[in-house]
Amino acid sequence: MLQLNKPLAFIDLETTGVNPGSDRIVEIAIIKVLPDGTKSVKRKLINPEVPIPQTASAVHGITNEMVKDAPTFKQVAHELRQMLDGSDLAGYNSNRFDIPLLMEEFLRVQVDFDMKGRRLVDVQNIFHKMEQRTLSAAYKFYCDKILEGAHGA
C-alpha cells in the first residue's frame, strides 16, 4: 500500500502533438489520491483553440468536432490549479511531457502554478528499470489488467 504524506495527483494529457512548448491540451485526466486514500477524479475535453492535426486524432481519437464546444484551457485553468494545489504530481512520461506541457498551458493563460515543494513521480522512469518499456506493460504490471483505449486520458 502506498503511504502518502500529502496528496498525489496522477495526470494524463492528450494533446495536439508532442512538443510541450507549442502543442495544446485536448483532454486532461487527473486522479488525486489523498493521504487517507480518498480519491477524486476529473476528466475534461478541452478546446485547444487550434486545429487538432489528423496525426494526433489518429493516436487519441479526439477530433476537432468533439472539442468545438468544450471549454478552453483558460476557462478551466483555475479549477485545475485548485485541484492540483498542494499535491505531488505523477504520471507516465510526465516529467518529460505532461508536466512541461501543463506548465506551458498555465503560463500561456497567465495562471500561476507553483512547482516549489512538489515531488514528481514519473512511473516511466521507475518502470524502465524493470520489464518492457511500454504503457501497456506498465499497466499490466501495476494493475494486473490488459490496457484498452491507451490514448484516452
PLM segments and residue spans:
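Conserved non-catalytic scaffold segment of RNase H-like nuclease domains
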Residues: 1-117, 132-150
